[in-house]
Design a protein with these regions (language model features):
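Solenoid-like repeat scaffolds
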Residues: 1-8, 32-41, 67-80, 107-116
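Amphipathic alpha-helical interface segments within eukaryotic helical scaffold
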Residues: 1-32
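"A position-specific structural signal for the A-helix of alpha-solenoid helical repeats
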Residues: 9-21, 46-55, 82-93, 119-135
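Residue-level detector of the short coil/turn that links helix A to helix B
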Residues: 23, 57, 96-100
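Intrinsically disordered, low-complexity segments enriched in Gly and acidic/Ser/Thr residues
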Residues: 47-85
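A hydrophobic, small-residue-rich beta->alpha segment in the mid-to-C-terminal subdomain
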Residues: 69-73, 81-101, 108
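Intrinsic disorder/low-complexity signal
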Residues: 98-138
């Protein structure tokens, strides 16, 4: 059996994802920050770090990571497949702090990514809510 090299980037990334899945945000933040410092930030690393910060309740730190991810995506020649994740994480942060900004961002996200599964699910839930609400209309 092969042992894992604890310093290998893939091992560190997998460890951070396991920590995230188990709500161990401090360990995940440490691992992801270390990876960003060693290899440079990427949109995926910044999104994962933001998710860990959201779990820990550090919404301002998460928004900082997400802003960095948006800035980084603007520097790329082609759109990043991780960009929708950045918007969804921002929505998660803003939902509890600024509902007006969250609603505006949701509108922008829905316009830019109309076929994204998140947008489709939101449209389905809006329709279901409207149908149930119509049953109770006075």
């Amino acid at each position: 059996m092969v042992t894992a090299d604890e310093d290998a980037p893939l091992t560190q990334l997998a460890s951070a994802q396991v920590s995230l899945a188990n709500a161990q945000s401090k360990e995940a933040i440490y691992s992801l920050t270390t990876l960003s410092e060693q290899y440079g930030p990427s949109i995926a690393l910044l999104n994962s770090t933001a998710a860990a910060r959201i779990i820990s309740g550090d919404h301002s730190g998460a928004m900082s990571n997400l802003s960095d991810a948006l800035s980084l995506s603007g520097e790329l020649a082609a759109p990043s497949p991780s960009l929708p994740d950045t918007y969804i994480n921002m929505l998660s942060c803003l939902a509890s702090t600024d509902a007006v900004k969250a609603q505006a961002l949701l509108g922008k996200f829905s316009t830019e990514y109309p076929t994204h599964p998140y947008v489709k699910q939101m449209a389905m839930l809006d329709g279901a809510f409207d149908r149930v609400g119509a049953k109770f209309a006075v």
